[in-house]
């Protein structure tokens, strides 16, 4: 009878659990259940069953224990700067001791928020976007928000589908690296009062919050570096028809013009995105460049994976890097030093993009009225490694 009663009580509330042991009367005095209330014992056949109602640790419990206000506890948990280091350490120590977990559901009922942020990127496996996601997640977590990441696979239709799926989960805000060439989807989101932030890629005609690198400067910086190390026939393995690909191509052309070098269409290789990974596309592009006469002596690649494929193809064909062809990528990915030839690259500051995106997103969510759209353009940085370290022995012209 006792077991049936306990089972019924447990079924009535998710906050009621049964201690795992059965206790005899001689053992009752030593029983302790942390964060719980002991309900009167039920006796059956000389055995005692203890029904325990779990009590969720609340912020006000921590505040009472430490002699602080609930507001102070909340600020610590949201990583608010207006808290002393001593108070922060006391609160975090107590939170860890009690294994306190914020009740997101209850919080959502009060605030009307889900505390979820969506991120849509073209390629989850690309290290550039992976680092942005990691940076963004870390920054959001400090303020009690959590990140859901999705991939569009460089497909505008899939991007719209993924965005709609995320919006169906009532996310508080979206952060998007779009592969679209039209703005209709974003105009619709604005009409629906759905806040969003664009990263890496911007769309013409759209006034929106944006964080990214100066892509025209990326193209100029990479191409000028190749020219500075003696290259006179500089090719470009270009990227997709997005703002990043278009502007890096413009920077490439500008650098050639500034150095009075001729631009040749045959030296610009556009590889179909398809389902082929970037390294394979880079290898195929380099195969085409090696068949040209005169052959390029320098190659600026849209990103590091393309450059990695290009280097491998050139080396396999017996071409020396950098003596015969100097190659530079973009992204400054962490594994560049472990390549067959360490790759020179342009740092796009992916970690900073994630941090800035989080800052702007949180600013939107915490503002009483929608703030004016903010644009953050980061300055690219040249990182020189072996793939472009050539002696300047070539004659000008």
Locate predicted features:
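Short histidine/acidic/glycine/proline-rich micro-motifs that form metal-
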Residues: 123-126, 153-154, 180, 239-243, ...
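Short hydrophobic/charged patches on amphipathic alpha-helices used for structural packing
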Residues: 106, 160-163, 186, 223, ...
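N-terminal helix-turn-helix DNA-binding module of bacterial transcription factors
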Residues: 14-20, 27-115, 392
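N-terminal helix-turn-helix/winged-helix DNA-binding helices
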Residues: 50-58, 96-134, 142-145, 153-155, ...
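Central regulatory/effector-binding core of bacterial HTH transcription factors
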Residues: 138-184
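Short beta-strand segments enriched in small/hydrophobic residues
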Residues: 65, 70-75, 109-125, 225, ...
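Bacterial carbohydrate/catabolite-sensing allosteric modules
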Residues: 5-8, 16-54, 97, 135-143, ...
């Amino acid at each position: 009878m006792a077991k049936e009663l306990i089972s019924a009580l447990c079924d009535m509330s998710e906050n009621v659990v049964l201690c795992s042991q059965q206790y005899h009367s001689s053992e009752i005095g030593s029983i302790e259940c942390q964060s719980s209330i002991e309900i009167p014992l039920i006796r059956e056949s000389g055995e005692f069953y203890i029904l325990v109602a779990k009590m969720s640790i609340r912020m006000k419990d921590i505040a009472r224990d430490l002699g602080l206000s609930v507001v102070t506890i909340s600020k610590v948990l949201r990583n608010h700067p207006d808290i002393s280091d001593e108070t922060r350490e006391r609160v975090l120590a107590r939170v860890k001791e009690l294994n306190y977990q914020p009740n997101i559901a209850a919080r959502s009922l009060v605030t009307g928020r889900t505390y979820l942020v969506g991120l849509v990127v073209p390629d989850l496996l690309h290290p550039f976007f992976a680092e942005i996601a990691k940076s963004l997640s870390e920054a959001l977590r400090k303020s009690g928000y959590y990140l859901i990441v999705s991939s569009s696979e460089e497909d505008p239709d899939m991007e719209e589908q993924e965005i709609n799926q995320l919006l169906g989960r009532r996310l508080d805000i979206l952060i998007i690296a779009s592969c679209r060439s039209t703005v209709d989807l974003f105009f619709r989101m604005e009409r629906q009062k759905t806040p969003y932030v664009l990263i890496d890629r911007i769309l013409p005609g759209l006034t929106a919050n944006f964080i990214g690198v100066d892509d025209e400067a990326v193209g100029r910086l990479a191409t000028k570096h190749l020219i500075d190390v003696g290259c006179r026939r500089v090719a470009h393995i270009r990227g997709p028809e997005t703002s990043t690909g278009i502007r890096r191509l413009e920077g490439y052309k500008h650098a050639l013009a500034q150095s009075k070098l001729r631009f040749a269409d045959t030296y610009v290789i556009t590889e179909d995105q398809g389902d082929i990974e970037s390294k394979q596309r880079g290898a195929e592009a380099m195969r085409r460049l090696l068949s040209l006469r005169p052959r390029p002596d320098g190659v600026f690649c849209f990103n590091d994976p393309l450059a990695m494929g290009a280097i491998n193809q050139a080396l396999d064909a017996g071409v020396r890097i950098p003596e015969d062809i100097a190659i530079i990528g973009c992204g400054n990915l962490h594994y560049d030093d472990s390549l067959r030839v360490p790759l020179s690259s342009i740092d796009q500051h992916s970690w900073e993009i994630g941090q800035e995106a989080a800052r702007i997103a949180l600013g939107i969510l915490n503002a009483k009225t929608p703030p004016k759209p903010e644009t953050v353009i980061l300055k690219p940085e040249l990182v020189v490694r072996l793939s472009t370290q050539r002696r300047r022995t070539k004659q000008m012209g």
